[in-house]
Amino acid sequence: MHSFLRTVGFSNITSRKELDKVLGLVMTHPTLDKHAFSSDDSHHKIIERSLDFSERMGITIRGEYDDKGFFHLEHYFPYLIGKKSGGYQEVSIFKRVDTDAYTGMCDDLRFGSSIIFYLQNSVDYISSKEESGKEMPLTLSGLSTSGKILLPILRTAEHVRAQAADSEQHVSLLQAAREGDENAINALTLLDFDTYSMITRRIQNEDVYSIVETSFIPFGSESDNYTILGIIKEVIPHTNSLTGEKSTEMLLDCNGLDFYIAINDEDLLGEPQIGRRFRGQVWLQGKVEFGKNKV
């Protein structure tokens, strides 16, 4: 069973027979139906069908029709389609070795490192034959199976302005450093040293979550899994139309990047409210709008 099925309201599926019933609904009553033809000599028809069990949240199945017209299920996954685009990003796409799926990667200067995500719309990528490495609109989202609500850090208006200015300066320095600017590289080194010194000093008397407001850290052996700490900007309740299970969707500000995540209410500790923070593990997903390259 897919471990994130519970996020979209299927925590009680315990057997393959129960799962097949749900996947059968996706196959016969899809909300979205896409297809493409494989690039190899067989030219098999690749099918991608999705069924929403709540708004923008559900299950996608992917497979192929053979020469005799029989459908072979290759892969399925739960999803949450985000509502907030992260803007144009230079995205590279890679086929996964372990399954018939694709992974996306982009560099975001707000993090200073690469972000890796599971590609939701693989059939769009196959049919578009788009080359990797181009700037295209990207919308990120995440599914979580464990999370807690934390209180916010008390911030004055002056502190918010100063933090925004520091963040803008940091992005500018990272951009310059990528282009080989030695002064920017030295400035970033000094900033890292100052940050380390500040944390070392404050951690003696304060909790780490009073010092660190948001974070985005790779988690576990899967490259698209992260431990995140983000500020809640919107809360949306969901109810699975088939099972009645309740989930919560939240818009998070994480290191200056806004994206939506969802979690089953049974897996969430605390009451989510705007201004509070969410901490948990997420499986990061992304939808790329292929063919809409930045001019």
Predicted feature residues:
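N-terminal alpha-helical "arm" segments
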Residues: M1-H43
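Long, hydrophobic alpha/beta structural blocks
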Residues: S38-G220
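Short, Lys/Arg- and Gly-enriched loop/turn segments at beta-strand edges
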Residues: W283-V295
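OB-fold (S1/OB) nucleic-acid-binding surfaces
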Residues: I231-I261
